[in-house]
C-alpha cells in the first residue's frame, strides 16, 4: 500500500473484486463513505460515551450541528446509497454476496445509522417526523439480517444491529427537545 498509495490500492482492490468498470464508479463512493465516517463515525452519531460512569453520557442526544449541516450530511449519504443500489443491479450474480459484504452493507448501514440519529435530532426539534428515524432503525435491522443470511448463513451472527445493546444502536426514544437546535 505504501508504494502505490491508498487511493490506487483501493481502486485496484475494487477492480479485483468487482471489475474495473465498477471500480471507477465505486472508488469515489468508498472515498466519500470514509470521509463522512472520519468526520463522525456512525456509532458516535448519538453523542454518547459508553465508557463514562455518569448515566447522562449513555443517553442519545443532539450533536452540535446546524440543521443545514444535518440535511447536507443526509443528502450526501443518500447519494452514496443510490449509487450503491445502481451498481448492485448491474453486477453479475456471483459478485453480489461479496458486494453486500464489502460495499453495500458498510455504506448503507452507515447511511441508515445517520438517518436514524440525525432525523431523531430533527424530530426532537419538530423539523421532521419520527417515522424517518424509526424507518432507518428498521432498515438497519433488515440489512443486518440480509448480511447474516449471505451464503446460506455463512456469516450468521457476524453482524449485530445492536452491538452490546448500547443506547446508540436502539430505536431512538420519541422525545421533544427543550432547548433550541
Pin down the residues of each PLM region.
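Substrate-binding groove of N-acetylhexosamine-processing glycoside hydrolases
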Residues: 1-181
Amino acid at each position: 500500500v505504501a508504494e502505490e498509495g491508498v487511493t490506487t490500492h483501493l481502486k485496484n482492490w475494487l477492480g479485483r473484486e468487482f471489475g474495473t468498470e465498477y471500480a471507477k464508479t465505486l472508488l469515489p463512493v468508498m472515498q466519500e463513505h470514509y470521509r463522512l465516517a472520519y468526520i463522525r463515525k456512525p456509532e458516535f452519531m448519538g453523542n454518547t460515551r459508553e465508557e463514562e460512569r455518569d448515566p447522562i453520557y449513555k443517553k442519545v442526544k443532539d450533536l452540535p450541528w446546524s440543521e443545514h449541516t444535518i440535511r447536507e450530511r443526509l443528502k450526501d449519504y443518500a447519494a452514496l446509497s443510490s449509487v450503491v443500489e445502481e451498481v448492485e443491479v448491474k453486477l453479475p450474480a456471483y459478485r453480489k454476496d461479496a458486494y453486500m459484504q464489502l460495499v453495500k452493507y458498510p455504506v448503507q448501514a452507515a447511511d441508515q445509522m445517520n438517518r436514524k440519529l440525525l432525523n431523531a435530532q430533527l424530530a426532537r426539534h419538530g423539523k421532521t417526523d419520527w417515522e424517518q428515524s424509526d424507518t432507518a432503525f428498521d432498515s438497519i435491522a433488515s440489512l443486518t439480517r440480509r448480511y447474516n443470511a449471505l451464503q446460506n448463513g455463512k456469516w450468521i451472527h457476524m453482524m449485530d444491529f445492536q452491538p452490546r445493546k448500547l443506547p446508540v444502536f436502539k430505536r431512538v426514544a420519541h422525545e421533544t427537545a427543550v432547548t433550541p437546535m
